[in-house]
Amino acid sequence: MAVHGLAPSQERLARDRVRAATMAAETVLHDLGVIPVTSSDAQGMGRAGETIRRTFAMAAVNKAARGPLPDDPPDADNARVLRYLAKLTINPAITHGIDGEVGSLEVGKLADVVLWHPAWFGAKPAYVLKAGLPAWAAVGDPNAAVDTAQPLVLGPQFAGSGAAPPDVSVVFVNKAAGDGDAIPTRRRRVAVRGTRSVGLASMLGGNDRTGVVRVDPAARRVTLDGDVLRADPAEHVPLTRLYHL
């Protein structure tokens, strides 16, 4: 749209893509476990730098609007947190055939870990480990007497600097490219697998519900098994300004 100077045809294209009804339905479908993966192009036209934060904000909005999940007691949200966490981690890994290397914390996989302070979960990570090594973390003023002196700024650490990144990373390729060994990279090559057989039944975290989803573009209405999906605009969205003063 910027290239064409907000031409009327481009504006109409944007309006056809960003529809309140389908965005609201997407929110409900995520909470029901019908959509198993979230991405940078979800929730409208996408927010690539805010995927994690927006995903857990969506979970909070659904909790406020729809109440606890059947597996959650009134004072806990573990089932919902695990459902939305799977949309960001193991389910995308399964979908792309790379769950043998990443997606969950298991023996034999890369120790790619994000550590959070509970008060800032979903908004500001405390540490990011890449293959078990510190790659990104909050650091204070190097001129200070203690390491907690503010301002704390997220920045690269040992695994995120110099020649270290290729040594703690992998490049995902198809089997032929992996066997051919012709890619000029220091990164370990790993072939993707199982992508042709992935289905909704392969998804984890309660994200395997099936149903008939229909989109009526004329009426701008979305139904699941005949039931219209609705979600009112949120009056409050968490993980926003309060966490980024």
Give the ranges of each region predicted by the language model.
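Active-site neighborhoods of metal-dependent hydrolases
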Residues: M1-L85, H96, W120
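Acidic, glycine-enriched loop/beta-strand segments at the rims
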Residues: L82-L85, A93-Y127
